[in-house]
């Protein structure tokens, strides 16, 4: 039995919702985890990605130590384009390669007042969850280290 009966687990319905999702919902889907340093600093695990964030690819063909700036967030295709992640086309021109945000970690955030508010709000709700005992003891110890 499913835990929440009002949410469907039908594959075709979920695919339909994914591909027909409006832009404001796609924004949330296009979230990336924060690096360990940022996670310690802000007490937030992930954030919706935006242009001018600095990211590092951690999965796939382009993974490596190089850190690049997000050039474009293409919500329609569910991909982001990163500064140094390019390939050459047959005619010789270089194009950016689309990468899904779940395959990168954010190493530097572009902060403005709205984004700072989001970080504070997320950290606050995480703190409330910790007080309720939502996270295991090991997780709490790791977060404090």
From Swiss-Prot:
Component of the large ribosomal subunit. Interacts with DHX33. GO terms for cellular component: cytoplasm; intracellular membrane-bounded organelle; large ribosomal subunit; organelle membrane. This is Large ribosomal subunit protein uL24. It is found in: Cytoplasm. Component of the large ribosomal subunit. The ribosome is a large ribonucleoprotein complex responsible for the synthesis of proteins in the cell. Pfam families: KOW, Ribosomal_L26. PANTHER family: 60S RIBOSOMAL PROTEIN L26 FAMILY MEMBER (PTHR11143). PROSITE patterns: RIBOSOMAL_L24. Residues 1-21, 118-145 are annotated as: Disordered. Belongs to the universal ribosomal protein uL24 family. GO terms for biological process: translation. Keywords: Cytoplasm, Isopeptide bond, Phosphoprotein, Ribonucleoprotein, Ribosomal protein, Ubl conjugation. It comes from Ailuropoda melanoleuca (Giant panda). GO terms for molecular function: RNA binding; structural constituent of ribosome. There is a cross-link at residue 136 (Glycyl lysine isopeptide (Lys-Gly) (interchain with G-Cter in SUMO2)). Ufmylated by UFL1 in response to endoplasmic reticulum stress, promoting reticulophagy of endoplasmic reticulum sheets. CDD domains: KOW_RPL26 (cd06089). The modification Phosphothreonine is found at residue 139.
